[in-house]
Design a protein with these regions (language model features):
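Bacterial Sec-dependent N-terminal signal peptides
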Residues: 1-6
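Non-catalytic cap/lid and distal C-terminal segments of serine-dependent acyl enzymes
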Residues: 19-291, 298
Length: 300
């Protein structure tokens, strides 16, 4: 305990993922004994047939070692966006220890950074009214378990009296869970900013776990800390779609919503788009719209 406490005060001289004024980004990694250090990121060009661990679409770039044993690389100017990356140290995937911002995409982790001065400013916490993100549990009779669900309510919801709100059911992709849209997807920040700018109507956004066999995201369920696997049994067998009305019932029993088809929307990314389409087909009187496209996350 003493040594762990002392570690809090160790000087952290090295910075990494430094966004420079010209929108280039500089990475630093101290590994004096390493023979080769590379950076894999979604900002790098990917060679044909190249696959980097869990990094989808990532390219691989050699870093340069200086006399102090620090490996460094600076990108070309990058577009405004949220980016992810990891290091490859002598072929071993490694998180950047000098950047504490790490996201998990189901079974893989990567560091992230944001280049602003553009559309990615929507991903940032800005000085606007903020909504509330609640981690809730609902009981599924069909799946015979309690399941975790994330629900965003807009700024002012608690003080808005009897006002009722439209609802968006936002579904994640194969590698995600109920936390995906609020971590990597920056859903709460985007909603706060769009609503403040008058570009989105204040709404309630419901983000469930689309893996029917799971209670909750890894580390949040009764299974404790276990090694997650990319695809759980039952993910694509229709159970999530079949019992989706249980989620609607929970939301409409606990929140002030406009409880009619015209004010319920559903959308999803990748697997979530597949689920959205099936739910809309199975329950045509329940939901007004369905967006199964992968470009759902586009905000410009």
């Amino acid at each position: 305990q003493m040594s762990a406490q002392q570690n809090l005060f160790v000087a952290q001289d090295l910075e990494s993922a430094i966004v420079n004024k010209d929108n280039t980004v500089t990475f630093n990694f101290k590994a004096p004994d390493a023979k080769k250090v590379q950076i894999a990121g979604d900002f790098a060009e990917r060679a044909e047939g190249q696959h980097i661990g869990g990094m989808v679409g990532a390219g691989l770039i050699d870093m340069t070692k200086n006399a102090e044993g620090i490996w460094t690389y600076t990108t070309k100017p990058l577009d405004s966006e949220l980016y992810s990356y990891e290091f490859m140290v002598d072929g071993v995937p490694t998180i950047d220890p000098n950047n504490v911002y790490v996201y998990r995409d189901f079974a893989t982790t990567s560091n992230v950074f944001i280049v602003g001065n553009g559309k990615a400013d929507l991903y940032k916490v800005n000085k606007v009214p903020h909504g509330t993100l609640a981690h809730r549990w609902y009981h599924s009779d069909g799946m015979k378990m309690d399941r975790r669900i994330n629900i965003y309510t807009p700024a002012g919801y608690e003080q808005s009296g009897n006002r009722k709100y439209p609802v968006l059911y936002l579904l994640h992709g194969m590698g995600g869970d109920e936390d995906e849209w609020t971590t990597f997807g920056r859903a709460a920040q985007i909603l706060d900013n769009l609503i403040a700018q008058g570009k989105a109507e204040p709404m309630i956004v419901v983000m469930p776990n689309g893996h029917a066999a799971m209670e909750a995201a890894p580390g949040e369920s009764s299974l404790g800390y276990y090694k997650p696997y990319h695809m759980k049994n039952g993910t694509m067998d229709g159970a999530f779609e079949t019992y989706f009305p249980e989620i609607v019932k929970f939301v409409e029993s606990n929140y002030r919503v406009q409880a009619d088809k015209a004010h319920r929307a559903i959308a999803g990314l990748s697997m979530g788009g597949f689920h959205s389409a099936n739910i809309s087909l199975n329950y045509p009187c329940l939901l007004y719209t369905s967006d199964a496209a992968d470009d759902l996350t586009r905000v410009d």
